Amino acid sequence: TTGDANVAIGGGALGANTTADYNVAVGQAALESNTTGAQNTAVGRAALISNTTASNNTAVGYASLTANTTGTLNTALGTAALAANTTASYNTAVGYGSLDTNTTGAFNTAVGYAALDANTTGATNVAVGAAALDSNTTGASNVGIGVNALGTNTTASNNTAVGHEALKLNTTGAQNAAFGTAALDANTTAANNAAFGYNALGANTTGYDNASFGSLALQTNTTGNSNTAIGKSALLANTTASNNTAIGSSSLVTNSTGAGNTAVGHVALLSNTTASNNTAVGLSALQTNTTGANNTSVGMNSLIANTTGGNNVAIGGSALTANTSASNNVAVGNDALAANTTGTQNTAVGTAALDGTDDGLGNSGVGYNVLSANCGNQNSGLGENALAQTTGGQNTAVGAAAGYQVTSGGNNLLLGTDAGRTGSPGGAITTGSNEIVLGDESISEAHIQVDWTVASDQRDKTDFTALDLGLDFVKALAPVTYKWDKR
C-alpha cells in the first residue's frame, strides 16, 4: 500500500488499507475493510471492521463501530458501542452497548451501560447514565441524564430528564422537562410538562401543560392539565383537576378534583379537596377550606377557618378569619368581619369593620371600627366608629361616630358626625328605636330647598292639654308671602 503513518497490530488489522494515512488498528480484524479512510483509531477485536472510506472515527472495545462504513467523527468506547452504526456521523458512545443499534442517527451522545441502546435514526440525543434513553428509536433532541432516565422513550422528541428514573416510562410524550429523582417517572404520552424536584409529577400519565417545582409537587397528578405547583408538596394530592395554581409549601396539598384554584402562600388552601375557583393569597389563607367555592382571600389568615362557605371576598390580614360556612360576604381591611361565622350577605370595608359580627345578615359598614360590635341584621354604617356599639337591627348611620352610642335600638336614621350621641338633638340614642337625628349640637342652621312637610293627624295624638293662647295671640299674627332669593 501507499498509506503512511499507519499502525496495525493484530490479525487482519487494516488488512484492506490502500492509500489511507494516520490510522491506528489494534486487535484482530480492527479496521480490516478500511481502504481510504484516514485518522481512524480502532482498539479491540472487530472494531471498525466494516469501515471503508470514513475518517476521524475512534472505536475502543470489542465490536465497537463494527458496522460503520462511511460515518465520520464518531467516538465509541465500550464493547458493542455504536455497533450498528453505518453512515451516521458525530456520535459519541461511552459504555457497553451504548448506541449499539444506531444506524443513521447523528449528533447523539450516550454515556453509560446501554445508554441509547435501541436508537436507530434518532438524532441530537444526549443520554448519560445506565439505560438512559435505552428504548429510544427515532426520537430526537432528547436529554436523559441519570440511570433509566427516559428509559422507555421511543419516538418522542425534545424531552429533558435529569435524575434517576426521571421520565422513566415516557414513550411518545414530547416537550417534557423533568429534573429530580423519579420526576415525571410515570408519564407515558403527555406533553409539555415541567417537573423539578424529587418525584415531582411522579404519577402523571397523560396530563399535559403542567408545571411542578418542588419535592412531591403535583406528585399524584394523573390526567390533570394546566396546573402549576411551586413548593414542597404543593398540589400533592391532585389527580384529575386542571387549571390550578399553587405557590408555597403545602399549598393546595389535599386538592384532588377541585379546578381553577389559585393558592399563593404557605398552607394556602391546604385542606381544599373538590372546591373550585378559589383564590387564596397569603400565609394560611383559606387554609381549612374543603368544598367552599368561588372565594377570594388575600391576606395572612384571611378566611382561614372557612370550610364550606362560598362566594366570599376577604382582603386584609385576618379578614373573615372565623368564617366557616357563611356565603356572600365581603370584607376589606385587617380584621374586617373577623368574628363572622355563619352570617351572610355582609359587607365590611375598613380595619375592624364589623369585626364583632358572628351571625348577622345583610349588614354594610364602611370605615374604621364601623359596626364593630354588631350582631344584628340589615344595619348600614358609613364613617369611623359609626354604629360601633349597636347590636340592634335596621339602623342607618352616616358620619364619623354617628350612632356610636346606639346599643340595642333599631330602625334609627342618624346623619352627620356624632349624630345620636350625647349633646345631639334629642340627646343620645342608646336603646331607642324609630328615631331620626340630623347632626350634633354644633349644628346652628338647617336648610332645605322646599318646605318641611310634617304629618299631623288628631287620630295619631293623645293627652291633649289646653293652651292659654287665645284670640289676642291670633290677632297679633302678621302673615306674609315671600319668594326665595338665594344668596
Enumerate the predicted regions with their spans.
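Glycine- and small/polar-enriched repetitive beta-structure motifs of secreted/surface proteins
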Residues: T1-D457
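C-terminal intramolecular chaperone/autoprocessing and neck/assembly modules of extracellular spikes
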Residues: S433-R487
